[in-house]
């Protein structure tokens, strides 16, 4: 049985918790607080102590005269029935007689069910209840018929019979109709376990047949005292001490209950054998006509009030003396107990289930049996122990009635348990098991994202990663390798969604599609070819475009090299027909690999410029590979044929090795020898471009759809804001359109062509500069025109969040527990923090990638804190101050206040206009941050010829310098027979004759003092050396 707590016992005894704790200490039992639990033997001992004391507990019930009616209490009194107190019997439903008409005779004689043998009564003093609410004034006692003679208990002061009940006390709960009065006239027996005076019921056998063997006996409750073995509670005497009503079907010695006007008897309810019933006023009861409200109440039910289940008996016959008119039971309800009608069952409800009796507290309509019968309304019905059985506690304590036995598990429960048993466990953490399913995750996803896909707890995944040697948090972006490792442990397959595919899914969620021409074949019109000029640096790409456009762009480029992507549209005559060609100029420096790749992806034809005097160079091969990867046709322009040493034939032979075979050699690649500086053969090159486009490409687009294209370059203009150079690939872009470019969006405020002229619209294959974006987009980002600004904003924000996660996952280094020592020693690793600002996004990207590729050793590292397009601002200086960063301005300068702030705070701001100068200086700074490396340089050796002992200085070695020289305050080691005897010694004293000297050269003699080291012998060798800094490579 469950242990009870101190405050529960205090509530049962009707005293404060500190009184119970004090009594426990008197008994030698120590408890910590009122919430402490105590064992059953201690409960019995405590109950006996309160019974003997009498003052603190509830006194034994005694007859009381009727008192004047008192106001009805609003709540059940806490001093009512409990499981182990000697309060009035919980089963007694006695109440003051109500004013009623003359009693009616019961409709029929109810044959009584056989009763179970009552246990031996045990008498003893029991505590009396606390002050009870005064009952209503009792009316004149009705006339009763004399019952058959029965022997009365010798020590029973009240005439009300009270038989011991087989079960324990039943819990009481306030009934909805109000509490019934508890006062004089309620005690039906003073001592617990005392038999009824009426003896055996009429018509009932002496012993109940078929009692359940092995059932709990009344005296088995460990929370009752030894003197209360019968479990019967004392009851208050009935009003005016009158005899118990009896009649046909009633209890022995009592007549029928007087009936009220409403058809309900006003007399006290009869007591049935089988245990105590809830205390008066503790069980709620729907208020009916003629039944007055009952004052008083009881404590809330607790586990100590659980009744025992007695032996089952036969179901009582229907139609006993109920509370209905004429004593008959209600329709469908069982009869009352013999000796007085109980509360009969409601319509549709089963009868009461007390042993040998009819309706107890009956179930609601449609419910099961009453209190102790079949499962009735929750809170009333007991355990469905069958008719005549004492129910469990499910109904009594607000739980739905149901079988006590363990229900059969459903298939779903069994399957879940089986899957839990089969789930993988890593380090004691249970994980869901996959069946090889493919989980799609974006790059830079966190463990929380992964857990949502597989319905797992993110904290479990963090614990598993710790067991696998990886330290990550639940919301931290993790690398692809980490996700694959974790998924493999749970039998899942992780598919990292590429940025292109993720972007396509994002657009599809807004019913947008990029890269497809809308409409039918009739809507497609011919568009100009897009040609990208590629090649090695200084091979003449920009000069060629100048010659075609008849301009001088190269004069404006710093250092004479192109560091931006330029897009131009040129109208030329080919075969007496004017044709437009769009040219894209890409940088040739090795730092602009990504820029060249973007140019190749957005083009139709690639012109590979190769200098005739240099031949094929590294960036030539790289540009060639980009063009092949983009699957675009290539036209080779052999430039600088007019310079000394030019050999176009050599160039053709070199390119043959890379799969470009000239037409004159039987291939399909067109080679054109030109001189951009002199303007030679430019027309032939343009003709070759047009012929290649017409022969191998279908250049058509739909000009009436919403514009789509690619951002070639972008920058932050001081007067215009964000300016993006875009190439329209399909559709027509107009001023006023809402467009989203990467993570930037906005409404097109103005458009400029390559000559700086305002244009109202741009068709397919037209490069324009767009003004009106919220921020500077990245080079190579796709743009698309949408209908609403809200859609553009949502797409841009989601793209920005995705890029942040991917960048964080890229920057985050995997830290394993094995490498934790190295990480904790991170102070030894020097970091060069950089803030990069440039004039164009492509240049900033190229500079960042080139700097991050610098590798000068593991002791130093580069960390780019921030990169952006535009001038150096005060916020950049603030960031540099907080992180000791160097600000790099690439083709931009610091604004007025930002420059003053940088000078005042000592922030290092460096300006560059050529990319390779920036790379060289940053590399030199990294090498300067390296810790110096030292190497050992041998100075000389000295042979000990004599050992001189000095009380002041110790042993002094008289030596002959064999090689090199010996200097004072240098390091030395002592060798004996070729073995090192001592390391890291210091030459503390050096003398030649009696003079202190700083060095002794080869062939001279002298004296050497090695400080505190005195273990020197003749013929030992002293080798001296010094540590010199080694230059870093």
Curated annotation (Swiss-Prot):
Alphabetized Gene3D superfamilies for the sequence: 1.10.10.2480, P-loop containing nucleotide triphosphate hydrolases (3.40.50.300), Translation factors (2.40.30.10), Translation initiation factor IF- 2, domain 3 (3.40.50.10050)
Region (Disordered): 49-432
Stretch list, region G5: 675-677
Pfam families for this protein: EF-G_D2, GTP_EFTU, IF-2, IF2_N
Recorded GO CC terms: cytoplasm; cytosol
Region (G2): 560-564
Domain tr-type G residue range list: 526-698
G4: region residues: 639-642
Positions bound to GTP: 535-542, 585-589, 639-642
Protein name: Translation initiation factor IF-2
Origin species: Streptomyces coelicolor (strain ATCC BAA-471 / A3(2) / M145)
